[in-house]
Every structure is written in structure tokens, then in C-alpha cells.
Amino acid sequence: LEQKMLMALGDLHELRTARAEEKSESEEKKAELQNLEGNLTVQKQGQVATKNDRNSLLSITKNEEKKYQQLIKEQEQKEAELEREIADYERQIKVTLNASLLPPRGHGVLAYPLPDTILESCSSLLVADQKNCVTQYFGYTPFAASGAYSGKGHNGMDFRALVGTPVLAAGPGVVEATGDTDAECPRASYGKWILVRHNNNLSTIYGHLSGIDVRIGQSVSSAQRIGLSGRSGYATGPHLHLTVAITQAVQVSSFPANTCGKRRNITLPVVGSDPVSGISGYLNPLNYL
């Protein structure tokens, strides 16, 4: 009997031990489940926070984009108004022009204004070939047709050029003037500019520069570095603007520009025309490059 009681007590002890282990395992699983639920809650909260951050960022980005687009629109309107004022002023410049004094049209009459220049449109080239290519030609380009120049055509050629690219004189001559329209009318017109009078009755204007390396009255040789390209003045991106004009039609004037503020003048090269012959002082650079 004693032996049976000892065996029964042993079985009872094993049963209690098994139940204790089961309870411990159950509690561990319960704790694990609670921990998992906690992790899921944290993950869910994190996802909600991420979503909220994303929505907030998207909202901020949209607001900033809206502000940016509004600034662009205001700047375009300012430039269009200033171009209208410049055009009105240029219409008052009456000069006598003799086309026979101009050099014959031909490739190489003027040197390229940038290193590695190509006269093809950037849009027609592969990205790898888009070095200092043409972003806008002379005359009534699509951009001009959009009203960017208040009904006028583009008075020069635009070349793609990274900020700091050397700008080269298109021929031998003398630096007639330099200036910076940003000092008088920020983010409008040429920005930093150089006017060079050449020896063949042509003059060239270089605009949107980031630096000017020459002084007024200085003689320059063909392909000599005269400045650095940039995006000063009114520019949607870094580029060089090159204007070619008949020397007799070019003058540097300072005149009131309401666009720039009350009682403020803007100083820059302007180009007149011959009312008798109808010849414009602006020339297509492609005829001489």
C-alpha cells in the first residue's frame, strides 16, 4: 500500500510539473502574442505617422511648387512688360543705315562665342552631344511667339552654357561698354552684359554673364576670353545670349522703366532702325558665325 501511495504521489507530482510547464508555456505564448500585438500597433502607428509625414510633405511641396510657379509667372510678366518698354524706346531711335558697309554674309566672319560651340539646336541632338548648342535661334521663335518679347522676335541667339564657361570675343574689336541690369532691375533683361564694337561694322552683345573680365576701352582679339557665362538677368536657365547688330544702330542708353519701379532707370545697349530703308539694326548671328 505504501508503495502504491508513493507511486501515486509521484504521478501527481509529474502531473503538477507538467501543468506548471504548460501554464508557463501558455503565459510565454500569451506574452509573445501581446508583444506581437504591441509591435503591430507600433508598426501601424509608424505607418500612420509615415503617411501623415508623406501627406504633410506632399502638401508642403505642392504649396512650394504653387509659390514657385506664381513667382515664375510674375517674373515672366515683368520681363514681358520690360521688353515692351524697351521696344517702345527702340522705336524712337532713328538712324541711317547702309547695308553695303556690312561684311558679306558667310561662315566664320565672326568666331564662336563659346568653346566647343555647335550651331545645331540642342533639342535635335543626343544628350551626349548637347554641349554648347543652340537653345533658341534669332527671330520669331516658338518662345517669341508665346509673347515673351511683347510681339518682337528674339534679337539674338541663345547657347547652352554652364555657369562659368568662358565667353569669347566673336572678333577683334574694342569693349564699348559693360553693365549689369540686375543692379537696376533685378532678374530682368540682360543681367551682366558686354558690348564689343568690331572692326567690320558689326557689334556684339553678350548677356546673362556671371562675370566680366574686360574694361571699357580695352582692345580684344578674336576668341579672347572676355567673361564667364551665367544666368543673370531674366534667364530660365544658364546660357549665353549673343546679339549681333550694325554698329551705327547701337547705343547704350539709360531710360526710365516703370517695370523696375518708380523713378528708376535701366541702362543697357539698345538698337535702332532706319525708317527710310526699313533696315533693322539687329542681324541674324547665323549669317556670320
Residue ranges and their predicted role:
Residues V95, W193-I194, S221-G233, L242:
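Short hydrophobic beta/alpha edge segments that flank linear recognition/processing sites
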Residues K66-H198, L202-G207, G211-I216, T243-L289:
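Extracytoplasmic/periplasmic cell wall- or extracellular glycan-interacting regions that localize
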Residues L1-L58, K62:
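Amphipathic alpha-helical segments with strong coiled-coil propensity
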